[in-house]
Amino acid sequence: MEHVLGFVALAAGLIIGLGAIGACIGIGIMGSKYLESAARQPELMNELQTKMFLLAGLIDAAFLIGVGIAMMFAFANPFVLK
């Protein structure tokens, strides 16, 4: 029983930590590519900015879904039999 709770805490930490790292890297790469393309074609900056913010929201949504799953594992643990 204690091993299951320990592994669930470890898994929740990994889900949140690695998800945050992945989201930060993804948004950083996307932002750099946006700046490159805006410098290359300034007339498309408004259209590209709209798409960039939409994709940033989707990247953050994937991270927040992972946080929700980790919180479900931590507080409403489905792996512990009652």
Curated annotation (Swiss-Prot):
Keywords on record: ATP synthesis, Cell inner membrane, Cell membrane, CF(0), Hydrogen ion transport, Ion transport, Lipid-binding, Membrane, Transmembrane, Transmembrane helix, Transport
GO CC, any one term: plasma membrane
Locations listed in the record: Cell inner membrane
Stored InterPro entries: ATP_synth_csu_bac/chlpt, ATP_synth_F0_csu, ATP_synth_F0_csu_DDCD_BS, ATP_synth_F0_csu_sf, ATPase_proteolipid_c-like_dom, F/V-ATP_Csub_sf
Domain of life: Bacteria
Annotated CDD domains: ATP-synt_Fo_c_ATPE
Residue pairs linked by disulfide bridges in the UniProt entry: none
Membrane topology type: Multi-pass membrane protein
Main location: membrane
Transmembrane regions: 7-27, 53-73
NCBIfam families attached to this UniProt entry: ATP_synt_c, PRK06876.1
Assembly: F-type ATPases have 2 components, F(1) - the catalytic core - and F(0) - the membrane proton channel. F(1) has five subunits: alpha(3), beta(3), gamma(1), delta(1), epsilon(1). F(0) has four main subunits: a(1), b(1), b'(1) and c(10-14). The alpha and beta chains form an alternating ring which encloses part of the gamma chain. F(1) is attached to F(0) by a central stalk formed by the gamma and epsilon chains, while a peripheral stalk is formed by the delta, b and b' chains.
Family according to the record: Belongs to the ATPase C chain family.
Name of this chain's protein: ATP synthase subunit c
Organism: Methylibium petroleiphilum (strain ATCC BAA-1232 / LMG 22953 / PM1)
Gene name tied to this protein: atpE
